[in-house]
Each structure stands twice: as C-alpha cells, then as structure tokens.
C-alpha cells in the first residue's frame, strides 16, 4: 500500500484549482481522500451542477481550469467530480454543518461516506461557492 502523505503543495494546488473552478463550476464541498483499499490520494469536488448528464462538461471545466495554471502537485487525473447527492459529498456537507468555520479538517482512518479511508483532508468551507438557488 502507498504510504505517501498528502503534502502542503498538493493541498495548495487543490485550493487554487477550486478557486479557479468556482467561476464556471461552483464547488460546494472539496476534500482529499486516501482510500484504504487503493491507497491513492484523490481530490473530490462536489457541485450542485454535476449530474450524470453534465459530468463530461464538468471534467472539461476541470481541465480548462487546470490548464490556466498547471501544477506539478496536481493533475486532472487525481480529480473526481461528484454530485451533492453522492454519499461522500453528503458526509462532507454534514461536517461543514456540524463544524462551521474557516479551518480545514484533517481526517484519520475511518468510514467516510460509506468507504474506508486511511486519511483525508476537508477544505474549509470558506473557499467554497454557495449552492445555486433552484429556479423559480
């Protein structure tokens, strides 16, 4: 299993990507997870604009935002877009609701959104975009 730790540069690269993406694909929850079985770090980005029908366009936005400022510490292949209905997004949003604030959250080995993780990092809610209002 990969024993690699998440480093500050990866966290910062993810934060910059989230902030660029918010202009075209608002992100309401973002977190790095290291799956206990795969042992790989992935950056999960949850948006109310991501659905089965829009996922392809969403990844296009990720690539476009990444290409604005490529970073050696993050590639688009490490990014997983999810909807707010995904159990992982729901878990992150629940943490934001229970512990509002501007501090990041480090996660130890546990079950997160129904999967076993070795570690995780939840970005502070302060860098997220607000959820879209439903059309009236």
Language-model-detected regions and their locations in the chain:
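N-terminal presequence-like segments and adjacent domain-start helices
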Residues: 1-13
